[in-house]
């Protein structure tokens, strides 16, 4: 333990787990497991990259800073931390086919690229990611399962995506996929409609599920006020004429539609 710890470690008598006040880094040590040790809370970073670890069992449940487990023959993220204060990185692990066990909360970015992940449906239903999300260079055919809100960049290039079904509802940074790049701050229903109408055949096919009136109606039913604001620039478009709004929002809809016409 001392060899890999920068700070102080202690055995919690209540939980039987090893807590670290500082950083733990056992990278490039040819470890096959954590030798029966079960970590609890790490105040700093936890890194176990470039080993022979086949399972994340024993990893801490809480990491205050970054968590890195890249270049290991793991099959899933089961056993990994539930809370990561910094960036979660698991890349260059060709054996990784599932994101099941991913953290529920990531303070910064979630980086899961250059693996063999086939689906993102194993991610926690209400997963929170502070900044970016990168799932590039896997074997994804859809984005179903990703968090609804990404404050930073969202990257999914180098996959087998048939469409952008399941893409985040909000992207604060740049959106990047094969054949489509949307600049920072421009991810909106207005932009997606524009691509659906005027984009290349590939781009139109990619965004089609995101502008499907049935999908949008479901989002309206879940959050009518929020969707009213998101759609204000396209409310009068023929594509959305059949959308149904709560009776109390009809006047607001007309007002926002008029504001959208004048660019407000």
Describe each region flagged by the PLM:
Residues 6-12, 18, 112-119, 156:
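Cross-kingdom leucine-rich repeat
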Residues 9-18, 39-40, 60, 81, ...:
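Short, exposed beta-strand/loop patches in secreted or surface proteins that constitute
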Residues 23-30, 38, 42-53, 61-74, ...:
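Concave beta-strand-loop units of leucine-rich repeat
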Residues 34, 56, 77-80, 98-102, ...:
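Canonical leucine-rich repeat
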């Amino acid at each position: 333990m001392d060899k890999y710890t920068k700070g102080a470690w202690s055995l919690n008598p209540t939980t039987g787990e090893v807590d670290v006040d500082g950083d733990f880094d056992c990278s490039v040590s040819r470890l096959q497991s954590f030798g029966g040790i079960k970590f609890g809370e790490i105040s700093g970073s936890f890194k176990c990259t470039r080993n022979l670890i086949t399972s994340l069992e024993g990893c801490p449940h809480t990491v205050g800073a970054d968590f890195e487990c890249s270049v290991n023959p793991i099959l899933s993220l089961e056993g990994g931390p539930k809370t990561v204060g910094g960036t979660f990185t698991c890349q260059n692990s060709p054996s990784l086919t599932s994101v099941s066990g991913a953290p529920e909360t990531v303070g910064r970015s979630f980086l899961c690229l250059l693996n063999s992940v086939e689906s993102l449906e194993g991610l926690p239903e209400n997963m929170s990611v502070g900044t970016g999300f990168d799932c590039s260079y896997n074997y994804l055919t859809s984005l179903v399962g990703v968090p609804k809100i990404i404050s930073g960049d969202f990257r999914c290039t180098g996959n087998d995506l048939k469409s952008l079904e399941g893409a985040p509802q909000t992207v604060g940074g740049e959106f990047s996929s094969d054949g489509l790049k949307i600049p920072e701050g421009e991810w909106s229903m207005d932009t997606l409609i524009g691509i659906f109408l005027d984009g290349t055949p590939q781009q139109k096919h990619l965004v089609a599920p995101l502008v499907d009136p049935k999908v949008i109606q479901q989002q309206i039913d879940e959050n009518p006020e929020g969707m009213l604001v998101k759609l204000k620039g396209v409310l009068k478009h023929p594509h959305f004429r059949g959308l149904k709004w709560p009776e109390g929002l009809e006047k607001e809809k007309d007002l926002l539609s008029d504001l959208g016409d004048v660019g407000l």
